[in-house]
Amino acid sequence: VVTPAYDELRNLRELLPRVHGVLQSLPGVDAEVLVVLPGWASHAEREEIGVLGATPILRRPTDSFGDALRSGFAAVRLASDYIITLDADGSHDPRTMSSMIAAAPLADVVVASRYVAGGSTDNSLVLRLMSKSLNAVYGRVLGISCRDISTNYKLYRREDLQRVSLRCRDFDVVEEIMFRLKQARGPGFRVVEVPDHFRERVHGVTKRRLGPFVMSYVVTLLRLRWQFRRQPPRG
């Protein structure tokens, strides 16, 4: 489990015991939890993460979200079959990991989705409309059948994920991952969505800033669309 965290210690104190509780309840699952911290994280914070049963990892070379995921992926042990990513702010329900792991043999990516039957979100109507529109545009342009491409709560095959090259620095890296995996897998790329409830964070404020957030998504969409149109047909 890879969890990027940026000043989220109060949320992690509540989240990590819940994550461990779910993982320990699943028969035959041997898991590690990596919390990817900014480079300036204090020794005391890293120690507390360890006490909470997770391994602290410092993101490199920058404190961006993209580098946080790349640093976490690189640190996952090679014996692992899967990597689950989830946010550190408590917005993702750890209990959904049970459904994700159960669906793993059927998919290249398992998505904990807000927008399938049984899924839901605490976001406002405006944010829900923006999110659904974003996901619809990305799915259509990149040829990916998925209602919730933009969520960071996903399960990937470790071998596939560590093989692709990722460039994005911001939260748009989540969509880039899906595109790169689809490129690698071709027409057989399989996505399974399981329902998840997205709740508002309890402590702190979001690190997403609307202006840069939208701009990075637009730039990434245009770049990936260009690459998608240039890639040769398979088969």
Each language-model region and where it sits:
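A conserved acidic beta->alpha catalytic loop
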Residues: 37-45, 90
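Acceptor/aglycone-binding surface of glycosyltransferases and processive sugar-polymer synthases
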Residues: 60-75, 82, 94-171, 201-218
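Hydrophobic targeting segments
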Residues: 1-3, 12, 19, 31-35
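Short, well-formed alpha-helical segments that are part of the catalytic scaffolds
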Residues: 8-24
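Hydrophobic helical membrane-anchoring modules
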Residues: 20, 38, 143, 167-235
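Short beta-strand-to-loop acidic/aromatic patch adjacent to the donor-nucleotide binding site
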Residues: 80-91
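Short beta-strand/loop segment that forms part of the nucleotide-sugar
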Residues: 27-40, 59
